[in-house]
From Swiss-Prot:
Part of the 50S ribosomal subunit. It comes from Chlorobium limicola (strain DSM 245 / NBRC 103803 / 6330). HAMAP family: Ribosomal_uL30_B. GO terms for molecular function: structural constituent of ribosome. This is Large ribosomal subunit protein uL30.
Length: 61
């Protein structure tokens, strides 16, 4: 696996989103707009980001 770290920033609210998208945001450790987390980059995490790509911004560190 890679040693890259990525920063995930929630930029939009989950109001009006599906249950799957809300659960994914919670699993990522986010909850409200402007919350951010730093996690190790891996394929599983990239899949979660793809589900909520319209709600988050991703930066590679």
């Amino acid at each position: 696996m890679s040693d890259k770290t990525i920063r995930i920033i929630q930029v939009r609210s989950v109001i009006g989103c599906t249950k799957k998208q809300k659960a994914t945001i919670k699993a990522l450790g986010l909850g409200r707009p402007n919350y951010q987390v730093e996690k190790q980059d891996n394929p599983c995490l990239r899949g979660q980001i793809r589900v909520v790509q319209h709600l988050v911004k991703v930066e590679e560190l």
